[in-house]
């Protein structure tokens, strides 16, 4: 078998700029990981004329899996270029992989960019906001994402809005989380408010803070977000778009961080098992090697010291073995 292949996977777009941006990001992440990282989309991108992509056709996940299978790859590692746990990465990619009859080849999907708490994204969004010239009190901030059919993704948007308010010292009316679009039906009300509605409550020099990664039909300078703002902003409201997250200098490092930390539970099980066994053997070791006349207090101190040493040694070992940077 030929080892591991790493894929940086985005949702895909019919716009060449999105694929070209994905390729640039993959190169930057490759430099950081010191391994080849291949740019791949879930769908759409193969419809782009290769002439608009420097003569190199785009690759979608289905084709990447088939190629990996033909090359004898034993594990595909997916780095999701997604903010939250989109169904594209929780359902679609595993299904496409299974349908390809991969045999012994494994699929590992790392965490999306939000991670556990969105800490890194909060800082990047704050940077992009300030880059527009915004200052506290200058105008309403509209944190805008695409809109999602699942609440878990919208929860990431709302958590980022809360973190930004705390970091910037803003009230809810000063920073509003909103969606570009949503599906019809009350079951999708969690996306509220829509950007077109949130604009009605905006004041001053408003900034639409883009929770989008790459330019395309939605997030380009003449994309859907800009069109909505032009058509629905109240008369007299000044507004501007922030840079996209894909342009932030820290994004490659964040992707590399997601690559370096796995969510595999096996190391944790090994850690717990090894710790329990070591704790059980510690009293036996102390009784064999401690002086016979050592009192209870001395033995307790030895036991506590040995316990601390075990935890430190095991932590350092498992961190180096399973959390090391690839």
Language-model region placement:
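Non-cytosolic membrane-interface motifs at loop->transmembrane helix junctions
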Residues: 295-303
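Core hydrophobic alpha-helical transmembrane segments of single-pass membrane proteins
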Residues: 279-283, 304-312
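Extended amphipathic ligand-handling, pore-lining, and cofactor/metal-binding catalytic surfaces
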Residues: 1-266
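N-terminal signal sequences
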Residues: 271-292
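Transmembrane helix-loop junctions and nearby membrane-interface residues
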Residues: 43, 287-292, 317-320
């Amino acid at each position: 078998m030929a080892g591991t292949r790493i894929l940086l996977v985005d949702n895909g777009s019919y716009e060449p700029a999105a694929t070209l941006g994905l390729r640039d990001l993959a190169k930057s992440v490759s430099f950081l990981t010191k391994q080849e990282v291949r740019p791949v989309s879930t769908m759409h991108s193969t419809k782009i004329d290769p002439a608009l992509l420097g003569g190199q056709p785009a690759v979608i996940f289905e084709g990447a899996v088939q190629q990996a299978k033909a090359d004898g790859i034993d594990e595909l590692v997916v780095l999701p270029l997604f903010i939250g746990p989109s169904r594209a990465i929780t359902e679609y990619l595993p299904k496409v992989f299974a349908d390809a009859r991969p045999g012994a080849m494994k699929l590992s999907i790392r965490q999306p960019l939000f991670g556990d708490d969105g800490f890194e994204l909060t800082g990047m969004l704050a940077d992009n906001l300030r880059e527009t010239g915004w200052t506290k009190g200058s105008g309403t901030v509209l944190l805008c994402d695409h809109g999602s059919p699942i609440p878990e993704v919208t929860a990431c948007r709302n958590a980022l809005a809360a973190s930004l308010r705390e970091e910037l010292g803003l009230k809810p009316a000063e920073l509003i989380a909103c969606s570009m679009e949503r599906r019809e039906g009350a079951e999708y009300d969690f996306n509220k408010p829509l950007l077109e509605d949130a604009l009605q409550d905006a004041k001053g020099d408003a900034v639409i803070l883009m929770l989008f990664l790459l330019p395309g039909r939605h997030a380009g300078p003449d994309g859907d977000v800009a069109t909505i703002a032009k058509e629905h902003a109240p008369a007299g409201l000044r507004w501007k778009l922030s840079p996209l997250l894909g342009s932030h200098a820290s994004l490659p490092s964040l992707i590399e961080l997601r690559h370096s930390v796995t969510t595999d539970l096996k190391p944790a099980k090994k850690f717990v098992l090894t710790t329990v066994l070591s704790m059980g053997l510690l009293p036996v070791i102390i009784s064999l090697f401690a002086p016979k006349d050592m009192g209870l207090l001395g033995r307790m101190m030895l036991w506590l010291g040995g316990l601390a040493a075990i935890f430190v040694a095991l932590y350092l070992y498992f961190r180096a073995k399973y959390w090391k940077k690839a």
